[in-house]
């Protein structure tokens, strides 16, 4: 398929409605919504994520050898803001760093959009330190530390790291 991104173990292909439904099924499992969005899940959030966000260029991540979906990656092109998610059962296998590295190279070079981009921004919750460390391994640098108001398990403020790749 046009604009597929291939790595040694993965294929990042255009996301289908079935791929998005699989993501929703995984992320609505216990504790996954908090990890992904930083807020306690409720019916409004679950309803909100049933449709992909408008303006985000999504790719589904599949294993090259089996075609099995392991997560997704996307970028909100207007802000060059990266988002990604690997299903729980596929974590700690370095799929995330493999997908992020390949995706940002394709995005920055214009392969995905026909437009060159000069940066990618990623934000992650303090509670998700492994994501920040992975982003640093693929070349992101810390850009800012902040807070966002949300319903955290302990209080109403969640810390965030903002990282940048140029």
Place the predicted regions along the sequence by residue.
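Conserved GNAT-fold acetyl-CoA-binding loop/helix
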Residues: 28-50
């Amino acid at each position: 398929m046009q604009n597929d991104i291939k790595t040694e173990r993965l294929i990042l292909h255009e996301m289908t409605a079935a791929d998005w439904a699989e993501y929703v099924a995984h992320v609505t499992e216990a504790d996954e919504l908090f990890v992904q969005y930083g807020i306690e899940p409720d019916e409004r959030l679950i309803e909100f994520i049933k449709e992909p966000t408008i303006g985000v260029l999504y790719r589904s991540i599949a294993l090259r050898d089996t075609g099995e979906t392991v997560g997704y990656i996307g970028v909100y092109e207007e802000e060059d803001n990266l988002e990604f998610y690997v299903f729980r059962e596929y974590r700690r296998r370095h799929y995330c760093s493999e997908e992020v590295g390949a995706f940002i190279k394709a995005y920055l070079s214009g392969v995905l959009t026909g437009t060159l981009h000069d940066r990618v921004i990623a934000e992650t919750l303090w509670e998700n330190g492994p994501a920040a460390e992975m982003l640093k391994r693929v070349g992101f640098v810390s850009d800012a530390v902040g807070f966002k108001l949300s319903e955290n398990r302990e209080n109403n403020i969640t810390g965030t790291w903002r990282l940048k790749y140029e």
